[in-house]
Amino acid sequence: IVGSCLDNMQPQGFDKIKSISKNIYDICLEQKTQNMAITKIGGMLRTNKIKRIIFASVDKSPHCIQLHYIQDELRKMMNLSNIEIENYVVVNNELIKISSEVISLSKNLKELTNLKNKVGDKI
């Protein structure tokens, strides 16, 4: 599941995603709500035919980052232990794998501030 702008903004990175999976669905969370996406993806998962989901987006987009938050909401709705979930951002047409811990941390500004204060100007 990719941000719909990925193909235009990072075409070689998008091609790398296509080499990983032949089933690619795109969504623009600027046009559709995250809740709509969660409902649709949740319905797809309930078929029990999906064993792996990849979320991929451009980096630094306030809309695309929401794509990566979908997994947390899905976990609240259902057991995803039998589904492999991967997250990538594409920077300079390269896939950068992002852990679910980093995604969760990105929603916690207080904790990010604490980390920044610990490391100082190193980041």
Residue ranges and their predicted role:
Residues 1-123:
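Iron-sulfur-associated redox domains of electron-transfer enzymes in respiratory
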